[in-house]
A protein has these predicted regions:
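Active-site-proximal loop/turn and secondary-structure-junction residues that shape catalytic pockets
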Residues: 7, 18, 26-28, 59-63, ...
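Conserved, mostly hydrophobic/aromatic
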Residues: 55, 136, 166, 206
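Extended recognition/assembly regions associated with phosphoester-bond processing machinery
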Residues: 1-10, 16-21, 42-50, 68, ...
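Acidic-and-aromatic substrate-binding clefts and catalytic sites of carbohydrate-active enzymes
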Residues: 1-9, 28-38, 108-116, 141-148, ...
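Active-site acidic/histidine proton-transfer and metal-coordination neighborhood
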Residues: 36-133
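C-terminal helical cap(s) of enzyme catalytic domains, especially alpha/beta-barrels
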Residues: 217-237
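Acidic (Asp/Glu)-rich catalytic clusters
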Residues: 4-22, 38-53, 92-95, 124-128, ...
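Gly/Pro-rich active-site loop or hairpin
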Residues: 2-4, 72-76, 82, 144-201
Length: 272
């Protein structure tokens, strides 16, 4: 994040030409550990340099007692957790001097102690802190499948007025459960949810995530074209054929693609 050298030079050059956003996985907003202030101050220095449109992370915890699990672990959806995370969001926003954007995680279990639904928890968190939301449509589908619940019900109770950005990604079907792997094309069921989310969010900025088995640029571009077709409210037979099969080529760094037309508004915001 603050190593300097070529990585910093590249992000500076990108930020000079395009609107950028910063998306993290290490904030651990739900942990019982104290906030990592060194991490926050380094993040703030990076943000001051590249001037992102927003900074986002996940509604999760990644470690405890100083040990990083390197995973995005779910939090109990209770009033006590809400109080805890709201206080931490306030502190993060004070340090960063901007609203924080939080993403719904993919989940593989529910806590017996849960007293709130995830949409209700997120709505209350936004109301208390002024934070925004990053709606990961694939995570909604994965979590609802694993919990044997209906994503349509999730959408019906979701605080759409708080959505700043959306994510699309592929997942792995393990039969009895789904895993959010980001190494497959977006599934048809997720595209259908995205079409609904696009309308309800009034066209929130959208990003396609692909972290492993990364195919050719042409195949990635085809997925972007498919997303634009859904944004326009329909798909032709041709566009339906644009979803590629996974290519067995893995690289170590994720490749994330902003849908260009959706970012036009963010670019105008940056000029302003």
């Amino acid at each position: 994040m603050d190593s300097g050298g070529r990585p910093r030079q590249v992000i500076r050059k990108v930020a000079e030409r395009y609107p950028v956003v910063l998306h993290g996985v290490s904030l651990s907003i739900g942990s019982s550990d104290p906030l990592n202030m060194d991490y926050l101050h380094r993040l703030k220095r990076l943000a001051q340099e590249v001037q992102p449109q927003w900074i986002s992370d996940h509604l999760c915890w990644t470690g405890v007692m100083g040990v990083n699990s390197h995973d995005l672990l779910p939090v109990p959806l209770t009033e006590a957790t809400l109080d805890h995370i709201a206080a931490r969001v306030h502190r993060v926003q004070e340090v960063l001097d901007r609203p924080l954007i939080l993403e719904n995680p993919s989940t593989y279990l529910d806590f017996r102690a849960n007293t709130l639904s995830e949409p209700d928890f997120l709505r209350a968190l936004c109301a208390r802190t002024g934070c925004g939301l990053l709606l990961d449509v694939n995570n909604v589908y994965v979590s609802c499948f694993n919990a044997d619940s209906d994503p349509a019900d999730y959408f019906d109770s979701f605080p759409w007025n708080c959505v700043v950005q959306m994510h699309l990604a592929g997942h792995t079907d393990c039969g009895t459960h789904l895993i959010d792997t980001h190494d497959q094309p977006v599934r048809p069921e997720v595209w259908a949810l995205f079409a609904l989310a696009w309308t309800r969010s009034k066209g929130a900025a959208t990003l396609l995530e692909w972290d492993g088995n990364i195919p050719s640029f042409e195949d990635c571009h085809a997925e972007l074209l498919k997303s634009k077709a859904y944004m326009k409210g329909g798909l032709s037979e041709l566009v339906n054929r644009l979803t590629p099969d996974p290519v067995p080529l893995a690289i170590s760094n994720p490749v994330n693609f902003m849908v260009p037309d959706v970012m036009a508004g963010a670019a105008e915001m940056k000029k302003g």
